[in-house]
Amino acid sequence: MKIYVLRYGHRPGRDKRITTHVGLVARAFGAHGFILGDVIDEKVIGSIKKVMERWGGNLYIDAGVDSRKYVLEWKRRGGIVVHLTMYGLHIDDVIDEIRGLNKDILIVVGAEKVPPFFYEVADYNVAIGHQPHSEVAALAVFLDRFYMGKELHLSFPNAKLIIVPSPRGKKVKKIAEEEEGESTKD
């Protein structure tokens, strides 16, 4: 089972920071792919790839795909579509059912006003809460609930840097220098 995140409605002049954060949360919280629908924004893709070069991971990334066709093809191949929206069913009421299907999941995260198509084609319209909030927060909460917190303990292949947990300060270990000693940044 794989989870991909489709970012719909990205506006390059306005949304690059938030869309980058959607991609970074997808990676950090255990998604397998990030799709930037309908546009190609090299800054967003470059930022996510730069993080992966340093911090590891094998997140599949694509951009410029037709969002509607991608969703329809996902469903045709037997996957389910989850649209995160504050208007949907509460996550507590559907997360166990979604997890229990054991199918590939495409999570749709909108930027601009989401057209009715996505509400209608989604197998689940899921609300993290029924109040306005960030799509980044919604994705993080959904993935955390889906994986039941296990994603917070992921380690990423090919990492050049890892965090060394510390009660104070910042400690970062360079993996390439592991044999020579620990490198820290304070």
Swiss-Prot record:
Judged by the first EC level, this protein's enzyme class is transferase
> Which InterPro entries does UniProt cross-reference here?
Alpha/beta_knot_MTases, tRNA_m1G_MTases_N, tRNA_mtfrase_aTrm56
What reaction does this catalyse?
cytidine(56) in tRNA + S-adenosyl-L-methionine = 2'-O-methylcytidine(56) in tRNA + S-adenosyl-L-homocysteine + H(+)
Tell me where in or outside the cell this protein is found: Cytoplasm
Residues where S-adenosyl-L-methionine binds: 84, 110-114
What is any one of the record's Gene Ontology cellular component terms? Answer: cytoplasm
State the Gene Ontology terms under molecular function.
Answer: tRNA (cytidine(56)-2'-O)-methyltransferase activity
Q: What is its EC number?
A: 2.1.1.206
Tell me which UniProt keywords the record has, alphabetically.
Cytoplasm, Methyltransferase, S-adenosyl-L-methionine, Transferase, tRNA processing
Keyword Transmembrane carried by entry: no
Q: Which GO biological process categories is it annotated with?
A: tRNA nucleoside ribose methylation
Gene3D superfamilies documented for this protein:
3.40.1280.10
Q: Extract the CDD domains matched here.
A: aTrm56-like (cd18083)
User: Does the entry feature the keyword Isomerase, yes or no?
Assistant: no
HAMAP family assigned: tRNA_methyltr_aTrm56 (MF_00077)
- Biological function: Specifically catalyzes the AdoMet-dependent 2'-O-ribose methylation of cytidine at position 56 in tRNAs.
User: Which family would the database say this protein is a member of?
Assistant: Belongs to the aTrm56 family.
Assembly description: Homodimer.
Which protein are we looking at? tRNA (cytidine(56)-2'-O)-methyltransferase
What is the species listed in this Swiss-Prot or TrEMBL entry?
Staphylothermus marinus (strain ATCC 43588 / DSM 3639 / JCM 9404 / F1)
Organism lineage string: Archaea, Thermoproteota, Thermoprotei, Desulfurococcales, Desulfurococcaceae
